[in-house]
Amino acid sequence: MLLGFFRLLFKGLYRVRLTGDTQALYQQKVLITPNHVSFLDGILLALFLPVRPVFAVYTSISQRWFMRALTPIIDFVPLDPTKPMSIKHLVRLIEQGRPVVIFPEGRISVSGSLMKIYDGAAFVAAKSQATIVPLRIEGAELTPFSRLKGLVKRRLFPRIQLHLLPPTHLPMPEAPRARDRRKIAGEMLHQIMMEARMAVRPRETLYESLLAAQDRFGARKPCVEDINFQPDTYRKLLTKTLFVARILEKYSQPGEKIGLMLPNAGISAAVIFGAIARGRIPAMMNYTAGVKGLSSAIAAAELNTIFTSRTFLDKGKLWHLPEQLTQVRWVFLEDLKGDITLADKLWIFAHLLAPRLAQVKQQPEDAAMILFTSGSEGNPKGVVHSHKSLLSNVEQIKTIADFTANDRFMSALPLFHSFGLTVGLLTPLLTGAEVFLYPSPLHYRVVPELVYDRNCTVLFGTSTFLANYARFANPYDFYRLRYVVAGAEKLQESTKQLWQDKFGLRILEGYGVTECAPVVSINVPMAAKVGTVGRILPGMDARLLAMPGIDQGGRLQLKGPNIMKGYLRVENPGVLEAPAAENQHGEMEAGWYDTGDIVTFDEQGYVRIQGRAKRFAKIAGEMISLEMVEQVALGASPDKMHATAIKQDASKGEALVLFTTDNELTREALLRYARQHGVPELAVPRDIRWLKQLPVLGSGKPDYVTLKNMVDEAETTHE
């Protein structure tokens, strides 16, 4: 009677809905593992699960008065993690056929993300061999009974959903010591909990995700700021988005691919979301690629119009691009204000009241944006991403990192760079954090000063950029930082040590590729290992393809929701080439993407990058990583830049060419370092060429295409 009354009350107030297959709850041995977001969680499960479970409640909570008051509707047993007998009691209950609920986090989330997972829950699952039923509670974190005050827009009676996920099992790990078995089991349960979060992510478009963020964090919450130092709230960003959306319709057609050549600025975010809302597909133009690279991008994506800014072209000294790229129409944002009419203003006002109506009909699987590869190994390729792939990567990042609305991101990597777009714009916008968009990562004195002035807590960049920020920064500039993330190139040991010594900060290294939107793996405070790029993100499958001549590791192939829709190539303009990869049997498998990177996995699942498959030289029958050669050069000459190319050799097949900005670097110095660090002599180049400055791409990576051309030209001249 009492249970029925409370069930009706909660259903009326919170519109509680239970989804998923409930049959798993009736199996012989069941362990239910929900996330923990509010004080309502236990009551919700007791009221709406079709079985009457036993709740494991920590003794510090079970002894409070309100737990005694809940005794008529909730069965619970005290859990003391310091006493093994309480764990054994839970195992016995499961073996007797009672469904048991354990909150693996052990406490209510204070970030909105998963907290750490206690090993005890995992050990109970493994010891009892119970069927694990993951459960996601969504919506209760918005109530006053959560611990997210100030992080979300709380409301009295939000809609609450209880998602039952497909059942799984957790085998008892094999390890000599019980402590190790518990730890491994805990990591396995953590993976299950992360996969559960990914499984219930909403099906929405990028524009809908912006509206959802506004609803979750509040229309008046500041979200974007740029060098004008006028922060935009979600409401103001939406207003700009609708303005741009309305005007873009006059210059493009639904479904058309349009080029965007814009700096890191608040208006750029509005243009991206505005174009997407009205069914246009923004192609982010890499203005550092030069006329040749941009011509390839324009041809591959079949672009007719590029939107840019006169101010941006003036400050960036980029007017030569529209002057030479005459095959497209150039539209300047400054000219659009004059096109606004009374009808347009009325349309914008009406859609501010009902913003969802501004979006043309779209599906999450539809093409949303086009990014371009760097062209470091040939012509730039258009990488077409769907709403689903981009938002999946954001959700993967949110699942493993505890970013909150209290964070402030410093985003200086360009938005045409996948790292800059997903991590630098979409992730902060959709987690309620505020982002400061700065137009150039090369201003090594300015960026640290802005990090200090704007109280930024998250900074990311390439190893090169982070090293230069550290050189010019005051030791106190980064006092608020809690995440420093390196990606896009290998993190140098000297950079890591400099940040540790000067600022007391640990750089977290990650790995990504444009085709994966881009983050594939990353170290986070909860799971980090020196010398690796972290674990593969939840929701992704990974496999290694064996490579002849390479004993350790193989080519990394990936499959998951964040994989691109496909390539657009200049050789076949406008035709989408869906991802497919060759498996170990020599067959092409659709949906898999071959990264071309040689990696290894350790026993804990951490990834180590060995190098690009294309960046291996076969010398006297041995496979030599060009990246290893560059690491030797950096070890011998840490303050200079180095890059390696390959030339043909009559006696050994291939030979190494080292380009360096150190005019005093000798082979003897390289040999000395190689011998000290166990590097084979074959990896020490004989051909060392000095350059005043290495050719680099906009991302800061060496331009290997140009370097290879320099080698080939020299060989031709020599012949």
UniProtKB/Swiss-Prot annotation:
GO terms for biological process: fatty acid metabolic process; phospholipid biosynthetic process. Pfam families: Acyltransferase, AMP-binding. Residues 233-646 are annotated as: AMP-binding. The keyword Repressor does not apply. The active site is at H36. GO terms for molecular function: acyl-[acyl-carrier-protein]-phospholipid O-acyltransferase activity; ATP binding; long-chain fatty acid [acyl-carrier-protein] ligase activity; medium-chain fatty acid-CoA ligase activity. Its main location: membrane. GO terms for cellular component: plasma membrane. It is found in: Cell inner membrane. It comes from the Bacteria. CDD domains: LPLAT_AGPAT-like. It is a multi-pass membrane protein. InterPro entries: Aas, AMP-bd_C_sf, AMP-binding_CS, AMP-dep_synth/lig_dom, ANL_N_sf, Plipid/glycerol_acylTrfase. The chain crosses the membrane at residues 258-277, 409-433. Residues 15-138 are annotated as: Acyltransferase. Keywords: Acyltransferase, ATP-binding, Cell inner membrane, Cell membrane, Ligase, Membrane, Multifunctional enzyme, Nucleotide-binding, Transferase, Transmembrane, Transmembrane helix. It catalyses: a 2-acyl-sn-glycero-3-phosphoethanolamine + a fatty acyl-[ACP] = a 1,2-diacyl-sn-glycero-3-phosphoethanolamine + holo-[ACP]; a long-chain fatty acid + holo-[ACP] + ATP = a long-chain fatty acyl-[ACP] + AMP + diphosphate. Its EC number is 2.3.1.40, 6.2.1.20. NCBIfam families: PRK08043.1. Plays a role in lysophospholipid acylation. Transfers fatty acids to the 1-position via an enzyme-bound acyl-ACP intermediate in the presence of ATP and magnesium. Its physiological function is to regenerate phosphatidylethanolamine from 2-acyl-glycero-3-phosphoethanolamine (2-acyl-GPE) formed by transacylation reactions or degradation by phospholipase A1. In the N-terminal section; belongs to the 2-acyl-GPE acetyltransferase family. In the C-terminal section; belongs to the ATP-dependent AMP-binding enzyme family. This is Bifunctional protein Aas.
